[in-house]
Amino acid sequence: MSDDKFDAIVVGAGVAGSVAALVMARAGLDVLVIERGDSAGCKNMTGGRLYAHTLEAIIPGFAVSAPVERKVTREKISFLTEESAVTLDFHREQPDVPQHASYTVLRNRLDPWLMEQAEQAGAQFIPGVRVDALVREGNKVTGVQAGDDILEANVVILADGVNSMLGRSLGMVPASDPHHYAVGVKEVIGLTPEQINDRFNITGEEGAAWLFAGSPSDGLMGGGFLYTNKDSISLGLVCGLGDIAHAQKSVPQMLEDFKQHPAIRPLISGGKLLEYSAHMVPEGGLAMVPQLVNEGVMIVGDAAGFCLNLGFTVRGMDLAIASAQAAATTVIAAKERADFSASSLAQYKRELEQSCVMRDMQHFRKIPALMENPRLFSQYPRMVADIMNEMFTIDGKPNQPVRKMIMGHAKKIGLINLLKDGIKGATAL
């Protein structure tokens, strides 16, 4: 390892860490990325779907050479009970505007490619090394300690993922609140491209993204997801960490039951399990965003809690990339000023406030509280399924008007509850 002082050391080679290194290296900064895994992305998990707009701004036309899987053209949202599914299906032609596109990705392919772009721009990358501590002189972070080695830098960017222990060691990241996190589990199941296209009604390199609420998380806060890759599908679920103690089954068992659901089982029939992973997921929204800047240090990506689950979209990577670009731009400007103090690095927060990151985090700040409503994942999926079942059942008895069907099932939840939940949902979204 070099004894020289770096302009910046980035801890973590996920999407945020790699992009931060790329932007700084392009500007001629001396950048080192340290990753505890054996390669970039090997410790990371996502559903996963990448909304292209932020990476497109940094690497125009990236999808031509990047190892993306499929461009998403089919969107599905389902409410599941144990035996039924009510599904909204939206299909569109592939967007002509690259910034409007989104892609399914596998992190063990995407992240090494991103790190390769950073290295080609001049960044140094050291995998398989754990950063044990941050080095400080007084209140200022001046580098990192890895084993017996101390590496110095003007700025350290923490891209070490959700529940950042290094951020916590500085007092920047508070103790974990279980209601701010979820546990995610995922399987990658191999299928042929022809099977995928036939089963999901897509063609060529089109992709499908499918979100589920209700039975996948056993009626608790959370939900399921399915993304089509080139020759596999990513199938998994998340369950709120604060709800797991009340669950009737383990998270792995939830996934097994999800795979056996009548709406899912035919889609994965004959598939081969290629990968299993589990990970913590930030779900707290704006309320869990920690102190982002201190003397000589900034926090980006999942470590900063930049994730938005709106129920119909789940965003993390695009926000991580935007935060990484903001942090990198700040370091570049700080070097020009020869000022790496907290007041100088506060430009990072201003950059975030002008980007989609804090604007969207602020706009949807009420979503996490909305998602804690247990009726969203238990009673409402059941109500929708029961209404649809009654509408489509013809048994020789006189049919009720649809309005009476709906009102009868709505009363089971309570009209006041429906009104309160509707108002809360409208104000949150």
UniProtKB/Swiss-Prot annotation:
Keywords: FAD, Flavoprotein, Oxidoreductase
Keyword Zinc carried by entry: no
Keyword rRNA processing (UniProt): no
Entry's EC annotation: 1.5.5.-
Paired cysteines (S-S): none
Class of enzymatic activity (EC top level): oxidoreductase
Molecular function GO terms recorded: FAD binding; oxidoreductase activity
Pfam families, A to Z: FAD_binding_3
Cofactor: FAD
Binding-site residues, FAD: 8-22
NCBIfam families: PRK10015.1 (NF007450), PRK10157.1 (NF007542)
Family statement drawn from the similarity comment of this UniProt entry: Belongs to the ETF-QO/FixC family.
Role of this protein: Probably accepts electrons from YdiQ/YdiR and reduces a quinone.
Name this polypeptide is given: Probable electron transfer flavoprotein-quinone oxidoreductase YdiS
Organism whose genome encodes this protein: Escherichia coli (strain K12)
